[in-house]
Amino acid sequence: MIDRKGFYEMKEYRVGGHEASFLPDGNWKMVWSDEFDGTELDRTKWDYRLSMMGKRHPAWTDKGVRLDGKSNAVFSILLEDGRPVSSQLQTGYNFMDEPVVATKFGHDALQWNIGKLKKDLYTHKFGYYECRCKLQQKPEGWWSAFWVQSPIIGASLDPAETGTELDIMECFHHGVIAGHNAFTGGYGLDSKRASVGGVKDLDMTVFHRFGMKWDETGYTFYIDGKEDGHIDQYISRHPEFILISTEVKGYRYEDHQPVKEAFEIIGKDEFIVDYVRVFDPVKE
């Protein structure tokens, strides 16, 4: 991995009626996007992530996102069954997420320890991935993220074959963007990680652009047109899906209880996403 930072020539890519993208040098074409126009979430593009690692995750709901009619998806915390919850959106599915339903393999009382598989809505390999968003103002109660993940991460020891998790943006603390990660090997004994970059003192009151260029050389990360590091390990050659995440803190701790700060900001904080776009390079 290369911890390089600096301004590089970025190319403006205009999208009619919306904020422009800023892309690395070269020629690009947009191959997928959601501008969040209208007032209803496009369910042909997004589904709600409700389960994780074979269990229904208590932090998530399918009611925590609304479109504001101004081309934004607005994430917020709400109270559900006495618990503060929020939403994650995804364009595909991890094969280990769904809860296991008891069945049999033929006449044998045996089965794989995975739930029902789902067909992905959208996956992609290589290209440039960009999100423009305004971060939550009170991250002491919840966190936000923009990332991609392989549907079959960890199904083999070869990241080229079964993919990685790529964390383009994660915000756990005020003004801080965590280092960008490439995880491989799944989420157990074989898990490995490379990390690079990250910033402090980011202005939380304005929109920012977070991007990643993924190609045969690895992953290059960008914040507001400034390169924030390159990872040349664990290079995936498998199509992956996109996630926009929020999550109340505490549910992943040993007692699986939300932090008290989450209760204090119910209905008082928002994570706002202007757009998500995917670009492919145009071959000369």
Which positions does each model-derived feature cover?
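GH16 jelly-roll
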Residues: I2-E284
